[in-house]
Amino acid sequence: GRRLCQHVDRVRLLEHELQAGLPTLDPAGEARVRLPVAVNADSLATWFAPAVAAFAASAPVLLDVAVDDEGHTAEWLRGGAVLAAVTASARPVAGCNHRPLGAMRYLAAASPAFVHQHFADGVDAASLARAPSLVFSPKDELQTRWVRRLCGQHVELPRHTLPSSQAFVVAAAAGMGWGLHPESLIAEHLRQGTLVALLPNLPLDVPLYWQHARATSGLLDGLTH
């Protein structure tokens, strides 16, 4: 079913561009085409919306954005639910174009009071096994990856689940737990001291990629650029 939906979306893109080339097919010039995209929440909360706003304002499209973990957005593309995705997958999906976007830098951070309460003796496997952490969803492995990099072993983390990038920041600043946050999203909190980095010299950089269906479409190309 999803494959069929993706095929229909591609056909609609091509039909729209045919109409654009032959105005008599759409004399009102009001037809808009649906463009389904999958994006990870942190990209949506930081750079994605500003990056596509100008395109969405000038092109006859209606963006339909689905949110999922960056490690799973490629599945939306592979399954045919979307025509493009921001993903952490370095492997191109079959039938798709693939280009690197750069890396999103994450810092482990918490409120000063939380750090004093849970990490007064340092950030190590023992303290991390006791201190509540924040995760976006059961799919979110960023905290686990950062801990494994720090400790060289798996640590079972107590966790609160908060499926919102903004709620992550608010909860951390309120002392609910520690978590991995996009550096750009918490920069002001770090400057004001409402959040502190657990280990400032141990960021986690997550490479991101843009993948989109290999359809001959000026709209997809416009969104990509």
Put a short name on every predicted segment:
Residues 1-27:
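Alpha-helical "hinge/linker" immediately C-terminal to small N-terminal DNA-binding modules
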Residues 69-70, 87-92, 110-112, 164, ...:
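Beta->alpha turn/N-cap motifs
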Residues 83-87, 177-181, 198:
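Paired acidic/hydrophobic, glycine-rich loop segments that form the ligand-binding mouth/hinge
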Residues 97-176, 185-205:
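C-terminal regulatory
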